[in-house]
Amino acid sequence: AKIEQIVGWLKGVYADKPAVIAVSGGVDSAVALTLLVLALGKDKVIPICLPYGKQDMADARLIIEFNELKDKMIEINIEAVVEEMARLVVAEEGSVRKGNIMARTRMIVVFDLAKKLGAMVCGTENKSEHHLGYFTRFGDAASDVEPIAGLYKTEVWEMAKILGIPEIFYTKEPSAGLWEGQTDEAEMGFSYKDADLVL
């Protein structure tokens, strides 16, 4: 029922406009992308991959192929922009500041492409991240539409299973994809399962 509810809501919000969505290879963007395709159809959804340097985008490509959107994918490497910005403001490698610069650079690219394509930006924020403050203001939290903002992380995993999304998306460790080996739970110091029990 929750899926139908979100899909119906997305149809109403987007009307005839296309959607752009940054696809990272994590479960949040996988679920949001799949819901968008169910709501708007493949013709109206443009997935955007924004790797940093040699960042592995295999899972992002996997969910894009799962939704049969390979031909519509836009890929832009953000490394040069991030490095220049980090150099200008002297943000250290692996720091929260550098991570924020990455998230905000992705936001700039996604909103610019939305403007170019006459589209609305679909976000991938979940309720757990929001309550925990685990996001970058004006970065990954910036969007026009947030289809999974009402779902806790544990509910996002459940929805991924129901949608038939490949298992890798709900079995791997969640990561914001900011640097090598970075995981949400290591940064927060607790698991989403534990957090959701409290939230």
Predicted region positions:
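Catalytic subdomain that performs nucleotidyl-dependent activation
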Residues: 65, 97-106, 119-191
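Short alpha-helical "packing" element that flanks the helix-turn-helix/winged-helix DNA-binding module
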Residues: 194-199
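ATP-dependent adenylation/nucleotidyltransferase module used to activate substrates
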Residues: 1-132
